[in-house]
Amino acid sequence: MNRKLMAVILSGALAASIMTPFSAAAADDTILLWVPEATQTFTEQQIEAFKEANPDYAGYTYKVEPVGEGDAANNMLTDVEAGADLFNFAQDQLARLVSAMALTPASDEDKGWITEQNDENSVAAATLSDMVYAYPLTSDNGYFLYYDKSVVSDPSTLEGILADCEAAGKGFYMEINSGWYQTAFFFATGAELSYETDAAGAFTSANVTYASDEGVAALKAMIALAKSSAFNNGSSISNATNVGAIVDGTWDSGAAKDLFGDNYACAKLPTFNVDGTDYQMSGFGGFKLLGIKPQTDPDKLAACKALAKFLSSEEVQVARYEAAGWGPSNKAAQQNEAVQADVALTALAEQLQYSIPQGQYPNDYWTQATALGDSVIGGDYNDADDAALLEVLQNFQDTCIGYAG
């Protein structure tokens, strides 16, 4: 063989042997990401920073497609193999995605990093049966109290807030005929309501303890609230009038600032008192997570894990807050000056300590919860004793359990 030709072959072989992890041996050198449209450009910019900081993975082709959290989860459940390598999803889809084998569980090392970096509730939202399956991105979906500080002198108790609103002729808004907001009372007293699903999303079992002393205490608190002259059923500050205080979320922070002006203030949800016992209001919390699809190529998996770690890091979570307003789950990012100055996010972060990550619930549950709340608002239980309220809750509980299995 010609010596020059041999030299070319050998040099080519040597070059191939030192190629970066995306080498031609990989089955696929494209990494596909699904993110909400609002963060597509941001994510593309961060990937460029990732490649610059991680030259070993710069040779992969990174493709970012705009797919919302709900659609991303549904698409993965439909066809895992055709799905994105990394995708955003809401925590209520975790169990289904795990059952469908659509998520790569974190290694012990990665689990340690995720747990160390992020707040306890977001880590819990990414965990199933003691296994961490995703990288938390946010702790920013839930509800808390917006109030007019010229009206409400102390937002720590529901009784005090109502008294201040009544005295000022102002309204207190909370949507107690919503199964989402209603849990603020029931979970506060220790009542439980949750469901298990299979990979197809079918509800297989239910854990409901509303028919209990805890449930009766929660229902009595709702009845007392509805009796207040300040009470208004609602959760959208844009649709509210003459507001002294409202239970709402970060999505309405702009409208709240416009409404309250210099008197704009926020706080965690208050306590309420039933029969001499104080309960801290609870409720549902929501978290955005970043999942990795199982990979057959270990080099590509390493790249995906490095990218997930980068996109969920302190620096990127702060940048994402500044670009899109997403509230960080990263504990250090939560202490960032700009994040700390956001009083709505600060109030929500405090409230999420008392909230429960929302799982999946049957559509019929939401309808049933609305009916219960409507009966409270309508005064149907105003004269009911504890035994009668327990019967109401037993019927509610039996109906909810019947939605599973």
Region spans (language model):
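Extracytoplasmic/periplasmic substrate-recognition and gating elements
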Residues: 260-323
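Hinge/lid segment of periplasmic solute-binding proteins
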Residues: 91-143, 156-162, 266-268
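Extracytoplasmic/periplasmic solute-binding protein
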Residues: 133-137, 143, 160-207
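Conserved N-terminal structural module of periplasmic/extracytoplasmic solute-binding proteins
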Residues: 4-13, 17-93, 398-405
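A structural signal for short loop-to-beta-strand junctions that line the ligand-binding cleft
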Residues: 77-78, 82-85, 112-147, 171-174, ...
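Glycine-centered hinge/linker elements that transmit conformational signals in sensory
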Residues: 200-233
